[in-house]
């Protein structure tokens, strides 16, 4: 019986380094999406292709702890650690959402050593669009 041809790039043949880490990205965009329940940090190149991402949930926080500022700080540090190794020096920051993690994530991004060209708040604001949900009665 003939031997099966080993598949290139599969986990079974022991290739450890990923193909994405070979790209050098000098400039990128950091998207922070801070809701009341979670904070998601996505790092893309200038064309919008995702390089790295992290969230408070993937960092090990569960339940209501995902919405805390410390969880957002951890998620931002986790997402940026990989792209600094790939050579990112400059970045634009887009912050979306009303959550507690906005400022903490921005503080973690500033501390990472990446030069920020600008910080923009891209939270969607309705011009009196849909009717909001009724008030909670607890």
UniProtKB/Swiss-Prot annotation:
GO molecular function: rRNA binding; structural constituent of ribosome
Entry keywords, A to Z: Chloroplast, Plastid, Ribonucleoprotein, Ribosomal protein, RNA-binding, rRNA-binding
Biological processes per GO annotation: translation
InterPro entries associated with the record: Ribosomal_uS11, Ribosomal_uS11_bac-type, Ribosomal_uS11_CS, Ribosomal_uS11_sf
GO cellular component: chloroplast; ribonucleoprotein complex; ribosome
Annotated Basic residues bias: 9-23
Domain of life assignment: Eukaryota
PROSITE patterns assigned: RIBOSOMAL_S11 (PS00054)
Pfam families: Ribosomal_S11
Subcellular location: Plastid, Chloroplast
Disordered: annotated segments: 1-23
PANTHER family: 40S RIBOSOMAL PROTEIN S14/30S RIBOSOMAL PROTEIN S11 (PTHR11759)
Record's subunit section: Part of the 30S ribosomal subunit.
Family: Belongs to the universal ribosomal protein uS11 family.
Name this polypeptide is given: Small ribosomal subunit protein uS11c
Species annotation: Cucumis sativus (Cucumber)
Gene name of the encoded protein: rps11
């Amino acid at each position: 019986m003939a031997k099966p041809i080993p598949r290139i790039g599969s986990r079974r043949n022991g290739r450890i380094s990923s193909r994405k880490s070979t790209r050098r990205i000098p400039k990128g965009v950091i998207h922070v999406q801070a809701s009341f329940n979670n904070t998601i940090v996505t790092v893309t190149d200038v064309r919008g292709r995702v390089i790295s991402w992290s969230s408070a949930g993937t960092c090990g926080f569960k339940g209501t702890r995902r919405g805390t500022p410390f969880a957002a700080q951890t998620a931002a540090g986790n997402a940026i650690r990989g792209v600094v190794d790939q050579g990112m020096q400059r970045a634009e920051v887009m912050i979306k959402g009303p959550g507690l993690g906005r400022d903490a994530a921005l503080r973690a991004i500033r501390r990472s050593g990446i030069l920020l060209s600008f910080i923009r708040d891209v939270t969607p604001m309705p011009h009196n669009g849909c009717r909001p949900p009724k008030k909670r009665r607890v």
